[in-house]
């Protein structure tokens, strides 16, 4: 049943998606296979079993367009899903634009971001196969928070290697993870061989997602009843997130709207893919423009090289065909910690390579300027990562004003910034670098 006003477009719980969408069958060409780090041969399912459960490996390699969402997962999704699609009317008025701006609000989840969409699914499949503990990495802490939330619901333990600069910048993310029973370790650490090696070479390193991934994988591989879980990049992670875009499609249909522009921020690609992949065929047909926004300090899609590379610093992961800045790249310590990744999802990279998706990079200060305007018009404080999407949406709305076009702009609001207020304090005090 329709429950909406001009501000919010809502779906009933019964309208929540029953299947995830898998983009693999709709890519412009077959995806180059991941390669085994030791043999350089295509990875086989059994190669991944030391760190992933069989259920997720099957999803990773599935060619099926639609994958059923288990009812136990949908039951947990109902805690916060469906999420609202919101009309940003006050922002439109502030910009004096004829464009209509909508944002899909993923900050409604208990951890405050889109990340639980896959965290709950991954915890479910691991628990189903008897896994007792998960290890993972996290940048800004949103993914780590989501996995701690999910593992607690399935009575599992969780160890999170948090990039050191974010561990220092965002202490309340650590508190959130510990509240849900998680163990949080600043990375690099002395808990792993790779961590000790990096600390010996550079004791003052701010850390990176690539380093934290190496530590989490090493931990999982060396301990019984433990698997590794990740918050982005791989296809099974991205397909879990497509509940975002599938709901958005249904919500736009409720008000007879069709998007002209879809926008999302990009670190590894999960939030972006979740919103945009259900619309990929429309973009291939030229019916809309899809824009991926990344930080200029970590310009993977706009300045990276399209080639095989490791997903982590130590070279423990399979080699993935993607745009990459190099697996040993250490980005500047920007506040958008969730976007500080050297690579991107191979499916996203292929779509960028073929021109289905356009990429742009933005500097840090303009993103906070956009986030502040959004907070002062719409009332919600965006996460630093989300500010990248807000920036691009504002830029597109200004362009529509200049061209006098009534465009429909939809962007993904990946998470709120209530645990990122130090970043806003730094911005308001003039302490942020324009990297």
UniProtKB/Swiss-Prot annotation:
InterPro entries: Trp_synth_b-like (IPR006316), Trp_synth_b_CS (IPR006653), Trp_synth_beta (IPR006654), Trp_synth_beta/beta-like (IPR023026), TrpB-like_PALP (IPR001926), TrpB-like_PALP_sf (IPR036052)
Complex and partners: Tetramer of two alpha and two beta chains.
Modified residues (N6-(pyridoxal phosphate)lysine): 115
GO cellular component: cytoplasm
Stated role: The beta subunit is responsible for the synthesis of L-tryptophan from indole and L-serine.
Protein name: Tryptophan synthase beta chain 2
EC number, UniProt record: 4.2.1.20
Protein species of origin: Archaeoglobus fulgidus (strain ATCC 49558 / DSM 4304 / JCM 9628 / NBRC 100126 / VC-16)
Transmembrane segments: none
Entry-linked NCBIfam families: PRK12391.1, trpB_rel
PROSITE patterns per record: TRP_SYNTHASE_BETA (PS00168)
Protein's pathway: Amino-acid biosynthesis; L-tryptophan biosynthesis; L-tryptophan from chorismate: step 5/5
Family: Belongs to the TrpB family.
Pfam families xref list: PALP
